[in-house]
Amino acid sequence: MRFSDVLDIRNGRNQRQVENENGKYPIYGSGGVMGHADDFICDAETVVIGRKGSINNPIFVDEPFWNVDTAFGLVAHKEVLLPKYLYYFCVNFDFERLNTTVTIPSLTKANLLQIEIRVPDMDIQQNIVSVLDKICYLIELRQKELYNLDQLVKSRFIEMFGNPKSNPNSYPISQLSEHIKFLTSGSRGWAQYCVDNGSEWFITIKNVKDCRISIDNMQPINAPDNAEAKRTKVQEGDLLISITADLGRTGVVTKEIADHGAYINQHLTCIRLNKEILNPMYVAFFMESPAGKEQFESKNQSAVKAGLNFNSINSLRLLVPPLELQNQFAAFVAQTDKSK
């Protein structure tokens, strides 16, 4: 069957005439709730899909709502198609295949109505929905657990070191340059070395976040045997910081990553610290605290395209607590990460 056989598409409309912050009905765009309204277009159990912009982010809405003019409402014919079954189909369908522009991603009603969908008997649909609902519930619980663990670590940082902006423990303050043994940026133009069966990894900015380095979606690479590769190959305990785009994302190289063999790209800088004074994990969390983020914002070298140079990195200032305390915090982080 096609979408045209089993659902209707409700066009969104401009919300200006109905918008009211105290309105009864939510206003949905392709990214989620944008406000509230006094009227609605779509009934409960409708799937929202972007007409422009975010076209691959279906949303299931279980209450009446107003959809804006950049979002479609997919209304299932409930006698043959369960709304939640339609939602899960949309979650797994790549709407980018129907994109009609090369600039802002866009979908047309005509193209959507031609999508083919397998529609089994209602009892089979219900069984599929029940299984997927349970899976999504478990995923949501896990995500909440991970969030709570991250909040626990951030709270522990404040407990141990105090607010880094006010420095209540009067720890000495120094520039990062005083404790750097090695500093370099990553390689550019290495696309030719990126291969699916590569024996090592190429770390990009997407892998570096929240003081960790994720090996998920790591780019395999066969690095060249030259000075450039030797310079950009990471070692255990190296601190990585993003220096373009989303400034100040940090991660610490683990033994697993170092043993596998990994290199950084041009959007990252690699810092090898004097570990007799600074624990890299402590520095990572300090730099991702408000005290660190404010420095990255103030040192941004461009109003158009975010960027940091080596002088900016060297001049970053931080509190230097006793190393024993830093190590205790790093051990707490490691123990918490085992629960993830």
List PLM regions with ranges.
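Sequence-specific dsDNA recognition surfaces
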Residues: 4-44, 61-62, 66-69, 174-193, ...
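Non-catalytic DNA-recognition/assembly elements of restriction-modification systems
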Residues: 1-29, 114-130, 141-187, 315, ...
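Short, ligand-facing micro-motifs at secondary-structure edges
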Residues: 14-17, 34-66, 83-85, 94-100, ...
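A structural connector/turn signal
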Residues: 102, 223, 228-229, 258, ...
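Extended Lys/Arg-rich polyanion-binding regions
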Residues: 74
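A short glycine-rich beta-alpha junction/loop motif
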Residues: 2, 66-71, 103-123, 260-269, ...
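Ligand-binding loop in jelly-roll beta-barrel domains
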Residues: 78-82, 273-278
